[in-house]
Amino acid sequence: MKVLSALCVLLVSVATAKQQLSELQYRNAFTNWMIAHQRHYSSEEFNGRFNIFKANMDYINEWNTKGSETVLGLNVFADITNEEYRATYLGTPFDASSLEMTPSEKVFGGVQANSVDWRAKGAVTPIKNQGECGGCWSFSATGATEGAQYIANGDSDLTSVSEQQLIDCSGSYGNNGCEGGLMTLAFEYIINNGGIDTESSYPFTANTEKCKYNPSNIGAELSSYVNVTSGSESDLAAKVTQGPTSVAIDASQPSFQFYSSGIYNEPACSSTQLDHGVLAVGFGSGSSGSQSQSAGSQSQSSNNNWSESSQSQDSNSWSQSSQSQSSQDSNSWSQSSQSQGSNSFTGAGTGSGSGSVSGSGSASGSSSFSGSSNGGNSNSGDYPTDGNYWIVKNSWGLDWGINGYILMSKDKDNQCGIATMASIPQAIPKSKWN
C-alpha cells in the first residue's frame, strides 16, 4: 500500500506533457491508484471512471511540466471531474464582493513579523477531518479559537474544542450545521454562549444533531473578534502575527483539487466567489520554505498516501466535505509494485472506503515504475518555494496536500480571496473564567 501510493505520485512527476502514455500505462496507473485508495467499481462504472482518471492524469502531467511552483499529484480526487469535486466537496460560492466586514470594537496591537508559524509555537492542534459533513466553517472557527485560547493562557494548555457544538448549537445565529455556515457567526455564538466545550467532551459525529452543550466542559471562552480589512493582505499578515486566523478562499480550481506541494499559485482563482473555510497559521518567504510539522501539529512521514474517500451533497456557503484515513508512509521515489486479480474491477487492500464512486468488483494488472522526483516531497516537509506564502491548515485529513496543509500565494493581489473574508478571535485567559 505504501509503495503504491508513492508510485502514483511518482508517475506524474516523471512523465512529460509531450510523452504519450500507452493505454496499458494508463490502466496500470489506474489499477495501482485503485488499490492505494481501496476503490471499488461495478463493471458498468469502471470505464467512465477510468476515462476521467486519464483526463485528470493528463492535466496533472501537463501542469507539472510548466515549471510552476505548485506541484500536483494523483490524489483521492483523481477519478472525479472538477464539476463533481465542486458539487460534492465545496459549497455554493458565497459572493463576498458586497460584503461589509464590520470590525468588532476590540482592536489588536502588535507589529507584523517577517515570518510566523504558529505550529512551531504550539498554538495549532493536529489536522482534523470533517468527514462527510459540510462543516469546514466550524473547523476554521475552532482552529482560530484554540489558538487564541492558547495565546491568552500565556502560550500554554492547548485544548482542542468542539466543532460538533458549533454544528449543533449555532443555528440561531445563521449557521446551518453540516449544510454550511460562517466563521464569524461561530465566533458570535461562542462569545454570547459563554464558551465552547472541549472536543473530547463533545466529539465530532459528522451529522447535525441536538445541541448537547455542557458548561462544565468548557475548553475556551472568547471576548471578541476582529475582521481583517477586506482584501488587505498586509492587514491579514498583521492579524496572523497575533494568532491563527480564520480565512475563506476559492478552492474550486482543478489545481486546488489535485494540490500536492509547493506554493499554490492559481491566477484563475476568484477573490470574491468563496467556497471554503480554512485557517491561516503563518506566513513566510524565500527560495526554500521549511514547513516541517512541529509542536502543535501532527507529523506524518509521507505527504502523498492519499488514502481517502468521501461523499456529500452541500448547497450552502462554506460547506464541503471529505473523509480520509490517515496513514504513515515513506517517500521513496524509486518503487515497483504488482497487483493481481481477476474478472472484474477492484482495488484490493486492507480496510474499506465508501464514497461517491464506490462499487464492487476486482481488477488485474501489473506495473513497475521508477524514477526521481523534483517535486519536493521530502520527509522533513521541506518544499521548494519561490516567493511569499501563507501557511494554511485544511480540514480534509492528513492525506491531502502537505500533511493536511497548503502553502498559498501571498502578496499576489489577494489571490483566491484569502484576505477577503478573514477574522481572528480574542480569548479570555483561563485564570479569568467565571
Curated annotation (Swiss-Prot):
GO terms for molecular function: cysteine-type endopeptidase activity. It comes from the Eukaryota. Residues 285-384 are annotated as: Disordered. One of its GO terms (cellular component) is lysosome. Residues 348-358 have a biased composition (Gly residues). It is an enzyme of class 3 (hydrolase). Glycans are attached at N227, N305. GO terms for biological process: immune response; positive regulation of apoptotic signaling pathway; proteolysis involved in protein catabolic process. PROSITE patterns: THIOL_PROTEASE_ASN, THIOL_PROTEASE_CYS, THIOL_PROTEASE_HIS. SMART domains: Inhibitor_I29 (SM00848), Pept_C1 (SM00645). This is Cysteine proteinase 6. It comes from Dictyostelium discoideum (Social amoeba). The gene is cprF.
